[in-house]
Amino acid sequence: MKNISDLWNQALGQIEKKLSKPSFETWMKSTKAHSLQGDTLIITAPNEFARDWLESRYLHLIADTIYDLTGEELSIKFVIPQNQNEEDFMPKSPIKKMSKEEPADFPQNMLNPKYTFDTFVIGSGNRFAHAASLAVAEAPAKAYNPLFIYGGVGLGKTHLMHAIGHYVIDHNPSAKVVYLSSEKFTNEFINSIRDNKAVDFRNRYRNVDVLLIDDIQFLAGKEQTQEEFFHTFNTLHEETKQIVISSDRPPKEIPTLEDRLRSRFEWGLITDITPPDLETRIAILRKKAKAEGLDIPNEVMLYIANQIDSNIRELEGALIRVVAYSSLINKDINADLAAEALKDIIPSSKPKVITIKDIQRIVGQQFNIKLEDFKAKKRTKSVAFPRQIAMYLSREMTDSSLPKIGEEFGGRDHTTVIHAHEKISKLLSDDEQLQQQIKEIKEQLR
């Protein structure tokens, strides 16, 4: 066994690649390797809150990473520095030590207890995927087989897969449900060939009732693994066993994926998950806060939801970062504290939201007219022309609809907005002075 500090630094390097930046910096960066007690690797966490979070969320990820680096499955125990006594070092859930040369027993389903249908927040971007997943869970291999869920990182694909597994086991405790990533499938397949255990490997994954395989896109370019998965897929499908697959893209967009696999992925139902809208993001934060027993002011949840619009993982990570920051500096949570806690993870280059009123204000300054003139009925050129420029910019620089733009200009009809946009666009093609004016206005707005 290598020096544990070096081992842990290597592990952190691998884990950093698998987590979002906010999650890694909030939970992993401050951990340190303490010691190795028998088969248990002792890791220090900065406080009780962090320790509990690491145990509930990242135990398996860390154990898998250590296994990949050492070939040994060690128990992982988190402790707080000031409480390090002999009793603290006793592992809560020891993991059987196993060398890579020894055959594994039937794999555990590895389902996260927090990923259930009850904890999944339904929104416009995931409603269909949720309904399809529930249908599959209620009637495995009878509704959609395979079910293929795709979408960006951290949008809830893995959550739905775990939820399917939990539902099946809850309603049929004897069911053999296995969840794993395609990367793990690949690694185990390679090890089985090296150790001459291919038959054991095949029996392990072809004798299940439900196979949940995550991030299938990592099979791209791995010809032998694709061959093995092809036969695994066929065996399960022919025996009416449920297959659920996730990916960051639809089958047709996975490069170097064999056509025969691609076609099989398309046999069942393909559904996507898109980033959550503002209302869904707020609902996710509320549910997360309730699940963790956190009292978070509405203004803070609104602030986080407005700032983090990429995915659920970063959204929840931001919430926990705010809570952890509040705990560390011993201050109440409010919007100002949230802004301070998240300043390092919210891009400073986040595009400014430009409003129609912003445009009217800057155009008014440029042409020396009052804000009320934009809504007035005046038709003099000194007012009408700047108004048309403002309408043009509102169409170009905001997401507002034509009726909405018209409403902000004194309730004018949408055809008036179209006319203004067309007129200014035509003038810009050969009017250098106007081009310069528009450029200056845009620079001030940005």
UniProtKB/Swiss-Prot annotation:
Region (Domain I, interacts with DnaA modulators): 1-72
Keyword ATP-binding in annotation: yes
Pfam families named among the record's database cross-references: Bac_DnaA, Bac_DnaA_C, DnaA_N
One of the record's GO cellular component terms: cytoplasm
Compartment(s): Cytoplasm
Region (Domain III, AAA+ region): 110-326
Ranges for region Domain IV, binds dsDNA: 327-446
GO BP field: DNA replication initiation; regulation of DNA replication
Positions contributing to ATP binding: 154, 156-158
Keyword terms: ATP-binding, Cytoplasm, DNA replication, DNA-binding, Lipid-binding, Nucleotide-binding
Organism superkingdom: Bacteria
Region annotation Domain II: where it falls in the sequence: 72-109
Function according to Swiss-Prot or TrEMBL: Plays an essential role in the initiation and regulation of chromosomal replication. ATP-DnaA binds to the origin of replication (oriC) to initiate formation of the DNA replication initiation complex once per cell cycle. Binds the DnaA box (a 9 base pair repeat at the origin) and separates the double-stranded (ds)DNA. Forms a right-handed helical filament on oriC DNA; dsDNA binds to the exterior of the filament while single-stranded (ss)DNA is stabiized in the filament's interior.
Similarity comment: family membership: Belongs to the DnaA family.
Known partners and oligomeric status: Oligomerizes as a right-handed, spiral filament on DNA at oriC.
Full protein name: Chromosomal replication initiator protein DnaA
Gene for this chain: dnaA
